[in-house]
Amino acid sequence: IAADVFEHVQDTYKFLKKLKDKGDFFLFNIPLEISLLSMIRKKNIFKHSFENVGHLHFYTKRTALLTLENIGFKILNCNLVNNRFEEFKKNKKLHSLIINIPQYILEKLGKDLACSIFGGYSLVVLAK
């Protein structure tokens, strides 16, 4: 299990190649911080993530899966998890709910689209 790990590692490819030799099945949780909203908002999410949580690399669903596939992992299953809704469930602040209504509506049309526009998701990947 590598949950929220390889975005912190300087040489992601080297790390993942070594990891691949250590087992048969792998479960990854990868934060997806690149979105349309993250590119246009005034607050620099990339600087914030680097300074506060130490992320050296940033991913979309596609780039995360390509990274794993390029190393030689076979993707068995993947699922998008909306971290913002989980955060709202914890603190239940009204402004948090209101801000997330457009994302919630768009998610009903498709998680991939909502993730690409709003961000705030993680990708859970089962690989071999």
For each feature predicted by the language model, list its residue ranges.
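Conserved SAM-binding loop
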Residues: 1-40, 58-68, 73, 119-128
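A near-ubiquitous, low-amplitude feature marking generic local secondary-structure context
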Residues: 2, 47-51, 109-110
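Glycine-rich loops and low-complexity Gly/Arg-rich segments
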Residues: 25-27, 50-55, 99-105
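Acceptor/aglycone-binding surface of glycosyltransferases and processive sugar-polymer synthases
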Residues: 37-43, 49-50
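A C-terminal cap/extension of S-adenosyl-L-methionine-dependent methyltransferases
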Residues: 41-45, 77-128
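Acceptor-substrate binding/catalytic loop of class I
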Residues: 46-63
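Short linear sequence motifs
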Residues: 51-52, 66, 97, 114
